[in-house]
Amino acid sequence: MNHSERFVFIAEWYDPNASLLRRYELLFYPGDGSVEMHDVKNHRTFLKRTKYDNLHLEDLFIGNKVNVFSRQLVLIDYGDQYTARQLGSRKEKTLALIKPDAISKAGEIIEIINKAGFTITKLKMMMLSRKEALDFHVDHQSRPFFNELIQFITTGPIIAMEILRDDAICEWKRLLGPANSGVARTDASESIRALFGTDGIRNAAHGPDSFASAAREMELFFPSSGGCGPANTAKFTNCTCCIVKPHAVSEGLLGKILMAIRDAGFEISAMQMFNMDRVNVEEFYEVYKGVVTEYHDMVTEMYSGPCVAMEIQQNNATKTFREFCGPADPEIARHLRPGTLRAIFGKTKIQNAVHCTDLPEDGLLEVQYFFKILDN
């Protein structure tokens, strides 16, 4: 690999001390994984070229948040023509929608998405109102099956995702297979609709046909104006909170973790991807400050990339789910509770795959923090 090749991005960092947005040039050298930063306003080097293992080429796309030495940077633009040419056409976004009939198979479908080289950049379990369903299916309103389509898409929760990769629209359509699941089982037996769908309407998942449809549909579910889009599905009863930590999301473990939670008999009644900032994480983890020696490392891990928060429902949810997660240290978990989430998916006491609520009285509060306060 060419060690002099570099990609340049314009990045912003919010300085909490000065309450200012500071702008930098971020240079990434894929040959040796090193980074360099220049202060745009003051025209000076902010960080000399330094090897940094936690930033990868696939993290570099406009709109993404990346962590460089504990600073959370938002990539807002390309820094030069070469970077724009090389990386601009490389990544394409599309909408992936898991329909009500396949919600119980969300783990399997997300696993297929990850294995196909997609990055999930947004995710939210939602309940569509009739009006939202009509807006979504506006292209089908002259079709004879239109009313059945609207009825079906509003019968239960859906999961909407923004997914990213080269040629995303075509690749996602290929993974889905033919629109009718019966046809898919004959013509594309390994496709998502063949595996998890029933017929032409109850066909497990959806993907837009064109760049224009993808843009229109993503705007419905994830408005660029900063609005919430359709409502989340949190019920705020008999619940506890689970968060799939950024390292586990980035390692492509989300699908496997969802399958494990379902197979253990828990109901995932709400789910959403969040990019937390340091202030939010410190607020959420406040109960651990001064109590847990790893507090600062826990905070840094939780805002190092996107995490996925869930509302988990079951009787005595906090206690039973905490037992299913296992001891905080995965090494101890592997010896004492080898079937638990942290034993199977955790790496270290900080990167232990999941956070779960510790105290029964905090279950509802933690769920409310994500699904009432942050999803606002």
Swiss-Prot record:
Keywords: Cell projection, Cilium, Cytoplasm, Cytoskeleton, Flagellum, Hydrolase, Kinase, Nucleus, Transferase. Residues 3-91 form the DM10 domain. Pfam families: NDK, PH_NDK7_N. Undergoes autophosphorylation. Its EC number is 3.1.-.-, 2.7.-.-. InterPro entries: DM10_dom, NDK-like_dom, NDK-like_dom_sf, NDPK7, NDPk7A, NDPk7B, Nucleoside_diP_kinase. GO terms for biological process: brain development; cellular response to leukemia inhibitory factor; CTP biosynthetic process; determination of left/right symmetry; epithelial cilium movement involved in extracellular fluid movement; flagellated sperm motility; GTP biosynthetic process; intraciliary transport. One of its GO terms (cellular component) is sperm flagellum. Expressed in airway epithelial cells. Changing H206F: Abolishes NME7 autophosphorylation. Belongs to the NDK family. Possesses an intrinsic kinase activity. Displays 3'-5' exonuclease activity with a preference for single-stranded DNA. Does not seem to have nucleoside diphosphate kinase activity. Functional component of the gamma-tubulin ring complex, implicated in the regulation of the microtubule-nucleating activity of the gamma-tubulin ring complex in centrosomes, in a kinase activity-dependent manner. Part of the dynein-decorated doublet microtubules (DMTs) in cilia axoneme, which is required for motile cilia beating. Component of sperm flagellar doublet microtubules. Component of the gamma-tubulin ring complex. Contains 2 putative kinase domains (94-224 and 239-372 AA), the first one is involved in autophosphorylation and the other may be inactive. This is Nucleoside diphosphate kinase homolog 7. It comes from Homo sapiens. The gene is NME7.
